[in-house]
C-alpha cells in the first residue's frame, strides 16, 4: 500500500497565483471564493455588488487568506478595462480568470425582449469583452488560464417534466448563452493556445439551493449519483483547471453534474 502524501502535490496548488473571480458572492461564487483561497490563491473578487464582496473578503481574510474586492460592471467595457488595468498595476499580472458572473433578468418565456437583450449584454457581450481583455494581457506575458463557469443547460435541452406543477421553469436566454459559452471557450482556446494561455469551461449540473422537495427528488433521480450539487462539488474541478496539474488541458467543457449528461 502506498504511503499517503502529507500534502497536496505542488502542481495542484494555487499558491503564488493571482486569480480573478467574477461574481464572487453568489450561488457558486461564495463557495468558489472559499475553496480558491484555501488552495493558496491570492484572490480578487469582482462584481457590481462590492459590499457583498467585501463581506466575503473580510471573512476569508479573517482565516488568513489574501482576498480583496473590486467593482466590475460586466455590461460596460470601460469598467472591464479599468478593472484589468488596476489589478495588473497592483499585482503585476493575473494568472487566472474565472468567469462566474451571470445575470438572469428573464423570468418567463413571455418576458419582454428587453430582458433577453439585458441577459445577452452581460452573459454574451460582457463575457466576450472580459475574456478578450484579460486574455490579451495573458498573451502578452505568454501564460495564464481562463475558466468559464457554464451549465449543463449549455449542452442539453430542457426536461420540462422536472418543473411540472412547481411554478418553476427553464428559460431560453440561459440555454442560449451557456451554449454559446462552450463554443466561445473553444474559440479562445484555439486562438490563445499557441501563445501559452489555456481556456476551459466547467458546466455544473443542478445546484441545491432550497428548491421545492419534489424538484429535488425528480432531478436527483435523473443523475447517476442521485443528488444535486453542493458547495463542495465545484471547487476541486475549478482548482484543477486553474492549476499547473492541468497544463495540457485546454478547449474542454468539463461536466460536473453527477452523471446527468452521461445518459
Question: Can you name each region flagged by the protein language model?
Answer:
Residues 95, 102-103, 112-129, 143, ...:
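Catalytic Tyr-X3-Lys loop
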